[in-house]
Swiss-Prot record:
It is found in: Mitochondrion inner membrane. GO terms for molecular function: cytochrome-c oxidase activity. It comes from the Eukaryota. Residues 35-40, 106-128, 184-190, 257-261 are mitochondrial intermembrane. It is an enzyme of class 7 (translocase). The gene is MT-CO3. It comes from Syncerus caffer. This is Cytochrome c oxidase subunit 3. InterPro entries: Cyt_c/ubiquinol_Oxase_su3, Cyt_c_oxase_su3_dom, Cyt_c_oxidase-like_su3, Cyt_c_oxidase_su3-like_sf, Cyt_c_oxidase_su3_a-hlx. One of its GO terms (cellular component) is respiratory chain complex IV.
Length: 261
């Protein structure tokens, strides 16, 4: 590596943005093939290439940050700003779903029967599985904070315990959500209620799966002693993302499950 007189990371050429874009194209095309022709071959190819890209891209980042020391305090500051902007973009993403829900529910059209929920829709009881899901996610928010504080204090065993609990709660939430979808008395095809419900809660569920993946990677990195009390941005970003997922669920629960029912 040539000598440099600044603290910034000059990134080497990487194939992973290109393979990531191609895997995204394969996944979206595969979804269309699955929906219209009941063929999952292209979707499986897209998911496989996406998983391989994630593994190899994260492997390179871990090498650069943990072993080569490229993630200086200046670089970490830039990464923090990037993560904050990413979470802001996610807030705007979910704002569109809430807008669609409230636009439809605050002034129901005559086609919906002039009421909300629309005529013929039996909404889910907000005090059953949705309330359990809320308590599960809130508990995971507590455990991820415990993990963060343990890491800052250098308590490795407590950090691993708390992170394992958080991952377990995330997987439990996903299983509860899947069972709720399976038993729901309406589908995504049941008008604007079904579409807004399943799109909003479905994208949130996808974000829970993504966040759980981040935390699983952090768990294995911690097993290999990658994090220290002053060098752990990978975990910090995953924790921020998890708290964002928590807050979005609270808005979903209050809006769609409780008020919307």
């Amino acid at each position: 590596m040539t000598h440099q007189t600044h603290a910034y990371h000059m990134v080497n050429p990487s194939p992973w943005p290109l393979t990531g874009a191609l895997s995204a194209l394969l996944m979206t095309s595969g979804l269309i093939m699955w929906f219209h022709f009941n063929s999952t071959a292209l979707l499986m190819l897209g998911l496989t290439t996406n998983m391989l890209t994630m593994y190899q891209w994260w492997r390179d980042i871990i090498r650069e940050s943990t072993f080569q020391g490229h993630h200086t305090p200046v670089v970490q500051k830039g990464l923090r700003y990037g993560m904050i902007l990413f979470i802001i973009s996610e807030v705007l993403f979910f704002t569109g779903f809430f807008w669609a829900f409230y636009h439809s529910s605050l002034a129901p059209t005559p086609e919906l029967g002039g009421c909300w929920p629309p005529t013929g829709i039996n909404p889910l009881n907000p005090l059953e599985v949705p309330l359990l899901n809320t308590s599960v996610l809130l508990a995971s928010g507590v455990s991820i904070t415990w993990a963060h504080h343990s890491l800052m204090e250098g308590n490795r065993s407590h950090m691993l315990q708390a992170l394992f609990i958080t991952i377990t709660l995330g997987v439990y939430f996903t299983l509860l959500q899947a069972s709720e979808y399976y038993e729901a008395p309406f589908t995504i095809s049941d008008g604007v209620y079904g579409s807004t419900f399943f799109v909003a809660t479905g994208f949130h569920g996808l974000h829970v799966i993504i966040g759980s993946t981040f935390l699983i990677v952090c768990f294995f990195r911690q097993l290999k002693f990658h994090f220290t009390s002053n060098h752990h941005f990978g975990f910090e970003a995953a924790a921020w993302y998890w708290h964002f997922v928590d807050v979005v669920w609270l808005f979903l629960y209050v809006s769609i499950y409780w008020w919307g029912s």
